[in-house]
């Protein structure tokens, strides 16, 4: 069984919290992985408090993560994650597995920061974004940087493949409303 670390603001009431739960729902269907969850904060947003079956599944993953990290700390060994999925902004990413993916919404402009591009040179194996616009922000941005140790100028570009995976759309069939409104009891304003 492969160990997969999901680092995400999965319990927050935020856009990234909802995105994290979408990723969780997809990952839990994948056979052959053991899911460990590190619940991250997202600013000062509150956390979901409802006790649902999904919440219980998330709590199990959080418990597995805590137990594994306790064991790793006691034995002074690496927890040995095979895969890491980090949901959030790229500058928060730190590589913790053999294969690492960052799922991010990107940014609503035509370029990303140099800090985000630097992360693609620091062990980020793939970026997943929800739109072509977000992908273009990563793949079209470049910066000229000066390496003060070598005195060379180089161009900083995205060094990871970027895949577009749009948000799913839930089809809802509205239930018919069965009610009548009696408007005869209201005086006419005319």
Identify what each model region corresponds to.
Residues 2, 98, 190:
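Nucleotide donor/acceptor-binding cores
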Residues 33-35, 100, 162:
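Hydrophobic anchor at the start of a short beta-strand
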Residues 125-186:
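Donor nucleotide-sugar binding/catalytic pocket of nucleotide-sugar-dependent glycosyltransferases
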Residues 5, 184-190:
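Conserved donor-binding/catalytic core segment of Leloir-type glycosyltransferases
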Residues 19-21, 98-100, 115-118, 141-144, ...:
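Short, glycine/charged-enriched secondary-structure capping and boundary segments
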Residues 5-7, 46-137:
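Extended catalytic core of nucleotide-activated donor transferases of GT-like folds
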Residues 1-44:
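N-terminal subdomain of nucleotide-sugar transferases
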Residues 38, 103, 165:
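Hydrophobic residues at beta-strand termini and immediately following loops
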């Amino acid at each position: 069984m492969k160990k997969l670390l999901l680092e995400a603001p999965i319990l927050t009431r935020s856009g990234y919290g909802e995105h994290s739960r979408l990723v969780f729902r997809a990952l839990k269907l994948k056979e052959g992985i053991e899911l460990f969850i590190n619940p991250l904060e997202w600013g000062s947003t509150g956390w979901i408090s409802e006790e649902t079956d999904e919440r219980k599944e998330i709590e199990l993953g959080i418990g597995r993560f805590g137990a594994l990290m306790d064991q790793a700390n006691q034995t002074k060994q690496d927890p040995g994650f095979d895969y890491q999925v980090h949901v959030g902004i790229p500058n928060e990413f730190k590589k913790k597995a053999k294969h690492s993916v960052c799922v991010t919404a990107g940014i609503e402009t035509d370029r990303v920061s140099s800090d985000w591009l630097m992360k693609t040179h620091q062990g980020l194996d793939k970026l997943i974004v929800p739109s072509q616009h977000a992908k273009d922000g990563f793949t079209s941005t470049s910066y000229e940087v000066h390496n003060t140790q070598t005195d060379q100028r180089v161009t900083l570009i995205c060094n990871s493949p970027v895949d577009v995976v749009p948000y799913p759309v839930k089809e809802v069939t509205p239930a018919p409303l069965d009610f009548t409104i009696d408007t005869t009891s209201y005086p006419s304003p005319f």
